[in-house]
């Protein structure tokens, strides 16, 4: 171990901590070391560790966050070499609630709580839960659906080693969890010190160039194809409007997906996306056979160490202004829109119902209502609903209750999802599902809605978007809205292709 690397806590402190713990089931002891960033960014650190050009690489992820409303999430996270990957769904021969598997797996880990200086994620499960998993949470929504993308319904990496980048102190924190069910504390400490030292060596190695992904020549001007087309989507809108007028639902959220061939490496799509569409939830998840690339604006649900559950309904959108005055005027216009306010309040009520199902009703609160949140290109109406879990409920129960968001399904939620399944006839996959993490601490989680998210598989980027349909929605306008939502990501691909064509040439 190099002299400049200090592992914390030291072994004597860790032994003392182990002796002080009354709970004999505690078996995870996190240790860590700091590394000044030295101008090393999280995405370059990820490239050094993930080795994307290596065909024998393991799954990995990069989670980042961009500043919104002058608030910056403190940490970015990198994960490599998971101890185990949970994959479920028909493609894996496991058609069951993935949260049951995850909860059982994570029940075998119990982290020592009094290790100071750790970020909100210091080890745990990271990945996605697809929209289609709702059939396990709400069996009434189950329908026979065509599986176009052939992806796992859930994909979760269990990572004992996490590299966190602290945006405040501009330093990396390399964390490894010692599992005393698998080794003694002393042996585990030495192994952890070696793992941390090896990671530091890779991050500080300037003897070789940064291993950017290999990028072949770019084929320009490729086109996309929708799975339903203009006529098909407008028919979806018309059908849902009939159900709304009959009183079956108040709102429904149909979607369409486009397939766009591209010769870009998926990480080069992500690099451009994080620049042109900075968002609270930026992620690149390498599942080896496919990749998930996203810039989501919207929290689905999170929980903290005090069992407080939070969800953020977002509904109502207006563009950013060219000047501060125009920006504020547009925000006032959005606040004053009766249609946007009515739809938003409906989703807040839905969120309150979801929270009430698993939280003490006396703790359920609308913490923020109809506030404006500003993003890079748009402004949204945002609210916050929270509550404290009842003693018999867990974070997994909270996730099931809130999933999927009303903004991607409708209201009443179950009936809307039944109608959506019958109309779309295909699995949605990652779109409208959740991307995020579940900590080993047994309490915390943080999951965003998989919006503005792309799936890259076999040289094709899949983009998907939907829109909320109410009784007076216009079919053509709704079709255009979904296309506009997808075009933000499509433009990212086009711009990245043009940039890389200048560097590596065109095919």
Curated annotation (Swiss-Prot):
This is Anthranilate synthase component 1. Component I catalyzes the formation of anthranilate using ammonia rather than glutamine, whereas component II provides glutamine amidotransferase activity. Present with 6510 molecules/cell in log phase SD medium. Its cofactor is Mg(2+). Pfam families: Anth_synt_I_N, Chorismate_bind. It is an enzyme of class 4 (lyase). The modification Phosphoserine is found at residue 81. GO terms for cellular component: anthranilate synthase complex; cytoplasm. InterPro entries: ADC_synthase, Anth_synth_I-like, Anth_synth_I_N, Anth_synth_I_PabB, Chorismate_C. The modification Phosphothreonine is found at residue 223. The keyword Amino-acid biosynthesis applies. Binds 1 Mg(2+) ion per subunit. Mg(2+) binds at residues 343, 481. L-tryptophan binds at residues 65, 280-282. GO terms for molecular function: anthranilate synthase activity; metal ion binding. Belongs to the anthranilate synthase component I family. SUPFAM superfamilies: ADC synthase. Keywords: Amino-acid biosynthesis, Aromatic amino acid biosynthesis, Lyase, Magnesium, Metal-binding, Phosphoprotein, Tryptophan biosynthesis. The gene is TRP2. GO terms for biological process: glutamine metabolic process; L-tryptophan biosynthetic process. Its EC number is 4.1.3.27. It catalyses: chorismate + L-glutamine = anthranilate + pyruvate + L-glutamate + H(+). Pathway: Amino-acid biosynthesis; L-tryptophan biosynthesis; L-tryptophan from chorismate: step 1/5. Tetramer of two components I and two components II. The lineage of its organism: Eukaryota, Fungi, Dikarya, Ascomycota, Saccharomycotina.
């Amino acid at each position: 171990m190099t002299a400049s690397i200090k592992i914390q806590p030291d072994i004597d402190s860790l032994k003392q901590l182990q002796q002080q713990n009354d709970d004999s089931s505690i078996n995870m002891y996190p240790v860590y070391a700091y590394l000044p960033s030295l101008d090393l960014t999280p995405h370059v650190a990820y490239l050094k560790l993930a080795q994307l050009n290596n065909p024998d690489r393991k799954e990995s992820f990069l989670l980042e966050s961009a500043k919104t409303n002058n608030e910056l999430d403190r940490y970015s996270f990198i994960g490599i070499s998971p101890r185990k990957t949970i994959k479920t769904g028909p493609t894996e021969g496991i058609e069951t609630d993935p949260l049951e598997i995850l909860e059982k797996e994570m029940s075998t880990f119990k982290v020592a709580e009094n290790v100071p200086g750790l970020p909100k994620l210091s080890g745990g499960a990271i990945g996605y839960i697809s929209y289609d998993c709702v059939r396990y949470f709400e069996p009434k929504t189950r329908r026979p659906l065509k599986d176009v993308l052939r992806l796992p319904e859930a994909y979760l990496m269990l990572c004992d080693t996490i590299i966190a980048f602290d945006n405040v102190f501009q330093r990396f924190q390399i964390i490894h969890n010692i599992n005393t069910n698998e080794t003694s504390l002393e042996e585990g400490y030495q192994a952890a010190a070696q793992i941390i030292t090896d990671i530091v060596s890779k991050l500080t190695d300037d003897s070789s160039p940064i291993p950017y992904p290999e990028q072949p020549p770019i084929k320009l001007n490729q086109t996309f194809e929708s799975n339903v087309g203009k006529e098909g989507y407008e028919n979806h809108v018309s059908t849902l409007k009939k159900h709304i007028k009959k009183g079956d639902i108040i709102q429904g959220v149909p979607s369409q997906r486009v397939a766009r061939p591209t010769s870009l490496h998926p990480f080069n799509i992500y690099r451009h996306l994080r620049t042109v569409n900075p968002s609270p939830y930026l992620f690149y998840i390498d599942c080896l056979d496919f990749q998930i690339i996203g810039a989501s604006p919207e929290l689905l649900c999170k929980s903290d160490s005090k069992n407080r559950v939070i969800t953020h309904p977002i509904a109502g959108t207006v563009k950013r202004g060219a000047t501060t005055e125009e920006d504020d005027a547009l925000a006032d216009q959005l606040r004053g829109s009766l249609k946007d306010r009515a739809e938003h309040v409906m989703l807040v009520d839905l969120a309150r119902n979801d929270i009430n199902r698993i939280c003490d009703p006396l703790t359920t609160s609308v913490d923020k209502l109809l506030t404006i949140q500003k993003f890079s290109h748009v402004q949204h109406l945002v609210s916050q609903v929270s509550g404290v879990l009842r003693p018999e409920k867990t974070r997994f129960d909270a996730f099931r209750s809130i999933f999927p968001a009303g903004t991607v399904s409708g209201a009443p939620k179950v009936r809307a999802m039944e109608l959506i399944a019958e109309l779309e006839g295909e699995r949605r996959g990652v779109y409208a599902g959740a991307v995020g993490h579940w900590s080993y601490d047994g309490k915390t989680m943080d999951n965003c809605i998989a919006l503005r998210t792309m799936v890259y598989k076999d040289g094709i980027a899949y983009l998907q978007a939907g829109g909320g349909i109410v009784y007076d929605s216009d079919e053509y306008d709704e079709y255009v809205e979904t296309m506009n939502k997808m075009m933000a990501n499509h433009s990212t691909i086009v711009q990245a292709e043009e940039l890389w064509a200048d560097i590596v040439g065109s095919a």
